[in-house]
A protein has these predicted regions:
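A non-catalytic, amphipathic alpha-helix used as a structural packing/dimerization or gating element
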Residues: 70, 125-128, 148-155
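Alpha-helical scaffold segments in soluble metabolic enzymes
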Residues: 50, 70, 74, 125, ...
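Hydrophobic core/packing positions within alpha-helical solenoid repeats
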Residues: 2, 48, 68, 130-133, ...
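Alpha-helix C-terminal capping/termination sites
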Residues: 4-8, 54-57, 138-139, 184, ...
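Extended glycan-interaction surfaces of carbohydrate-active proteins
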Residues: 10-34, 77-118, 155-241
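Inter-helical turn/loop segments and adjacent helix faces that build the functional surface
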Residues: 51-63, 130-149, 202
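N-terminal start-of-domain structural block
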Residues: 38-39, 44-46, 153, 160, ...
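Aromatic-rich carbohydrate-recognition surfaces in CAZymes
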Residues: 1-94, 119-123, 127
Length: 241
């Protein structure tokens, strides 16, 4: 709707300034809460991607093309305080000491679930962003950047499958070296939902089947499968429990 587009542009006008200043390490009175978290800039790209669907890719590129390029360059050059682009094309984030995703429950200042390393939804967002921005700049004739992003997307997509997809047909929640979290969690569903996914149709169906069977309830998705270790349907006692 027209009013939704206008509302988005109004909000993004504020966000754009805050993002620009964060990327360039400039002082800014416009603070976005938890801007430093690894997924915030990637969600900003996704939001602009939805805007492009509402208006047109040409208008989106005209209005936000420079911002998108700045974000991707910032991430590619590893200037983010807690996102590191590894040689396999995946983004690595450190979440051992501080909760860095939406699963941000803490006890005594430390995350209850220390999601760290290659985090599934962050790298799904990364792949989606590479493909979307790569296509967008290519349509504008910036072939060098388009080729760079598309080549990186191919590498990222292959590494994503090698790293996250397991023999049971679902995605690991996070991987840090030899530490692999096999918990069945809803974070993997983003890889099915995004416009650009490293998974093919068969792999998407496998993920969706697991999520549907183990996580879907009449109230929404569980944050953990009853079949996974650590699942507890009832919580009593102090915060630690």
């Amino acid at each position: 709707a027209i009013d939704e587009v206008a509302k988005f542009e109004s909000v993004m006008e504020t966000a754009r300034k805050a993002i620009h200043d964060f990327i360039n390490d400039e002082p800014n009175d416009l603070k976005i809460y938890e801007m430093e978290h690894p997924d915030v800039l990637l969600w900003a790209v996704w939001c602009i991607q939805q805007y492009a669907k509402m208006v047109s890719r040409d208008k989106c590129r005209e209005k936000y093309g420079q911002l998108l390029e700045e974000i991707m360059e910032y991430l590619r050059r590893e200037n983010h305080p807690n996102l590191f682009l590894h040689s396999n094309g995946l983004l690595y984030a450190n979440g051992t000491e501080k909760a860095i995703t939406w699963m941000n429950s803490t006890v005594n200042g430390h995350p209850v679930i220390p999601r760290t390393g290659y985090i599934v939804e962050i790298n799904a967002l990364w792949y989606n962003a590479l493909c979307f921005v790569g296509e967008l700049v290519g349509e504008a004739g910036n072939n060098n950047l388009a080729e760079t992003l598309q080549t990186l997307a191919e590498q990222t997509g292959k590494s994503f499958i090698d790293t996250f997809l397991n023999e049971y047909g679902y995605l690991l929640d996070y991987v840090d070296g030899n530490m692999m979290d096999w918990s069945v969690r809803p974070n993997m569903i983003f890889t099915v939902a995004f416009d650009y996914s490293p998974l093919d149709a068969r792999q998407k169906k496998g993920v969706l089947d697991v999520v549907t069977k183990e996580l879907l309830t009449p109230k929404g998705l569980r944050s953990l499968s009853p079949k996974s270790g650590g699942y507890n349907p009832n919580y009593v006692g102090p915060q630690m429990q």
